[in-house]
Amino acid sequence: MSGRGKGKAKGTKSKTRSSRAGLQFPVGRVHRFLKKGNYGSRVGAGAPVYLAAVLEYLTAEILELAGNAARDNKKSRIIPRHLQLAVRNDEELNKLLGGVTIAQGGVLPNIQAVLLPKKTAKASK
Protein backbone atom coordinates (compact mmCIF):
# COMPACT_ATOMS: atom_id res chain seq x y z
CA MET A 1 0.00 0.00 0.00
CA SER A 2 2.44 2.62 -1.16
CA GLY A 3 -0.33 4.94 -2.34
CA ARG A 4 0.75 4.73 -5.97
CA GLY A 5 -1.07 3.23 -8.89
CA LYS A 6 -4.70 3.17 -9.95
CA GLY A 7 -4.43 6.91 -10.50
CA LYS A 8 -5.45 8.88 -13.55
CA ALA A 9 -3.36 8.79 -16.68
CA LYS A 10 -1.57 12.06 -17.34
CA GLY A 11 -3.44 12.87 -20.55
CA THR A 12 -6.99 12.36 -19.26
CA LYS A 13 -9.20 15.39 -18.76
CA SER A 14 -11.57 15.60 -15.79
CA LYS A 15 -15.28 15.34 -16.57
CA THR A 16 -17.75 17.41 -14.62
CA ARG A 17 -20.63 15.72 -12.87
CA SER A 18 -22.99 17.77 -15.03
CA SER A 19 -21.50 16.36 -18.23
CA ARG A 20 -21.57 12.84 -16.79
CA ALA A 21 -25.27 13.26 -16.06
CA GLY A 22 -25.90 14.95 -19.42
CA LEU A 23 -27.10 18.17 -17.79
CA GLN A 24 -26.51 21.87 -18.40
CA PHE A 25 -27.17 22.92 -14.80
CA PRO A 26 -24.14 22.76 -12.47
CA VAL A 27 -24.30 19.68 -10.25
CA GLY A 28 -21.27 20.78 -8.22
CA ARG A 29 -22.81 24.16 -7.40
CA VAL A 30 -26.12 22.55 -6.40
CA HIS A 31 -24.19 20.15 -4.14
CA ARG A 32 -22.37 23.08 -2.54
CA PHE A 33 -25.65 24.92 -1.93
CA LEU A 34 -27.21 21.80 -0.40
CA LYS A 35 -24.26 21.41 1.97
CA LYS A 36 -24.17 25.11 2.86
CA GLY A 37 -27.92 25.33 3.56
CA ASN A 38 -29.48 23.76 6.61
CA TYR A 39 -31.09 20.84 4.77
CA GLY A 40 -29.30 18.00 6.55
CA SER A 41 -25.99 17.04 8.05
CA ARG A 42 -25.00 14.94 5.02
CA VAL A 43 -25.85 15.11 1.32
CA GLY A 44 -25.86 11.98 -0.84
CA ALA A 45 -24.10 11.83 -4.19
CA GLY A 46 -27.31 11.43 -6.19
CA ALA A 47 -29.29 14.24 -4.56
CA PRO A 48 -27.62 17.19 -6.31
CA VAL A 49 -27.79 15.40 -9.67
CA TYR A 50 -31.52 14.79 -9.26
CA LEU A 51 -32.18 18.35 -8.07
CA ALA A 52 -30.16 19.86 -10.93
CA ALA A 53 -32.12 17.71 -13.42
CA VAL A 54 -35.45 18.87 -11.95
CA LEU A 55 -34.38 22.52 -12.05
CA GLU A 56 -33.20 22.14 -15.64
CA TYR A 57 -36.49 20.53 -16.68
CA LEU A 58 -38.60 23.25 -15.05
CA THR A 59 -36.48 25.98 -16.63
CA ALA A 60 -36.74 24.39 -20.08
CA GLU A 61 -40.52 24.02 -19.70
CA ILE A 62 -41.02 27.67 -18.71
CA LEU A 63 -38.68 28.96 -21.44
CA GLU A 64 -40.46 26.84 -24.06
CA LEU A 65 -43.85 28.30 -23.14
CA ALA A 66 -42.43 31.83 -22.83
CA GLY A 67 -40.85 31.50 -26.27
CA ASN A 68 -44.23 30.52 -27.69
CA ALA A 69 -45.82 33.56 -25.99
CA ALA A 70 -43.11 35.82 -27.45
CA ARG A 71 -43.67 34.37 -30.92
CA ASP A 72 -47.43 34.89 -30.59
CA ASN A 73 -46.72 38.57 -29.87
CA LYS A 74 -44.35 38.73 -32.88
CA LYS A 75 -41.31 39.36 -30.67
CA SER A 76 -37.91 37.67 -30.83
CA ARG A 77 -36.88 38.46 -27.24
CA ILE A 78 -38.49 36.98 -24.12
CA ILE A 79 -39.51 39.65 -21.61
CA PRO A 80 -41.05 39.22 -18.13
CA ARG A 81 -44.53 39.67 -19.63
CA HIS A 82 -44.01 36.54 -21.74
CA LEU A 83 -42.89 34.60 -18.65
CA GLN A 84 -46.02 35.75 -16.81
CA LEU A 85 -48.31 34.74 -19.68
CA ALA A 86 -46.58 31.36 -19.99
CA VAL A 87 -46.83 30.53 -16.28
CA ARG A 88 -50.38 31.79 -15.71
CA ASN A 89 -51.85 30.11 -18.80
CA ASP A 90 -50.39 26.72 -17.86
CA GLU A 91 -52.47 25.00 -15.18
CA GLU A 92 -49.67 23.03 -13.49
CA LEU A 93 -47.09 25.82 -13.56
CA ASN A 94 -49.69 28.27 -12.25
CA LYS A 95 -50.39 25.93 -9.34
CA LEU A 96 -46.65 25.51 -8.64
CA LEU A 97 -45.91 29.24 -8.86
CA GLY A 98 -49.21 30.46 -7.44
CA GLY A 99 -47.65 32.58 -4.70
CA VAL A 100 -44.92 34.01 -6.93
CA THR A 101 -44.98 37.58 -8.26
CA ILE A 102 -43.12 38.10 -11.53
CA ALA A 103 -41.76 41.65 -11.67
CA GLN A 104 -42.97 43.63 -14.72
CA GLY A 105 -45.22 40.69 -15.61
CA GLY A 106 -48.58 42.45 -15.71
CA VAL A 107 -51.87 40.59 -15.41
CA LEU A 108 -53.81 38.20 -17.61
CA PRO A 109 -56.38 39.88 -19.85
CA ASN A 110 -59.80 39.07 -18.44
CA ILE A 111 -63.14 40.90 -18.81
CA GLN A 112 -66.12 39.70 -16.81
CA ALA A 113 -69.04 38.58 -19.00
CA VAL A 114 -71.53 40.92 -17.29
CA LEU A 115 -69.42 43.94 -18.29
CA LEU A 116 -69.45 43.10 -22.00
CA PRO A 117 -72.05 44.91 -24.17
CA LYS A 118 -75.28 42.99 -24.63
CA LYS A 119 -76.03 41.57 -28.07
CA THR A 120 -79.35 42.85 -29.44
CA ALA A 121 -81.58 41.55 -32.21
CA LYS A 122 -80.75 44.55 -34.45
CA ALA A 123 -77.03 43.76 -34.38
CA SER A 124 -77.62 40.26 -35.78
CA LYS A 125 -79.68 41.48 -38.80
From Swiss-Prot:
Superkingdom assignment: Eukaryota
Function: Core component of nucleosome. Nucleosomes wrap and compact DNA into chromatin, limiting DNA accessibility to the cellular machineries which require DNA as a template. Histones thereby play a central role in transcription regulation, DNA repair, DNA replication and chromosomal stability. DNA accessibility is regulated via a complex set of post-translational modifications of histones, also called histone code, and nucleosome remodeling.
CDD domains: HFD_H2A
Pfam families reported in the protein's UniProt record: Histone, Histone_H2A_C
Cellular component, GO, one term: nucleus
Family indicated by similarity: Belongs to the histone H2A family.
Gene source species: Psammechinus miliaris
Modified residues (N5-methylglutamine): 104
PTM notes: Monoubiquitination of Lys-119 gives a specific tag for epigenetic transcriptional repression.
Keywords: Acetylation, Chromosome, DNA-binding, Isopeptide bond, Methylation, Nucleosome core, Nucleus, Phosphoprotein, Ubl conjugation
Biased composition (Basic residues): 1-18
Subunit structure comment from the entry: The nucleosome is a histone octamer containing two molecules each of H2A, H2B, H3 and H4 assembled in one H3-H4 heterotetramer and two H2A-H2B heterodimers. The octamer wraps approximately 147 bp of DNA.
Gene Ontology molecular function, alphabetical: DNA binding; protein heterodimerization activity; structural constituent of chromatin
Record bears the keyword Phosphoprotein: yes
PTM-bearing positions, type Phosphoserine: 2
Positions of region (Disordered): 1-21
Coiled-coil residues: none
Xref: InterPro entries: Histone-fold (IPR009072), Histone_H2A (IPR002119), Histone_H2A/H2B/H3 (IPR007125), Histone_H2A_C (IPR032454), Histone_H2A_CS (IPR032458)
Location in or out of the cell: Nucleus; Chromosome
PROSITE patterns associated with the record: HISTONE_H2A
Protein name as it appears in the record: Late histone H2A.1
Residues recorded as bearing N-acetylserine in the entry: 2
Keyword Translocase: no
Cross-link Glycyl lysine isopeptide (Lys-Gly) (interchain with G-Cter in ubiquitin): where in chain: 119
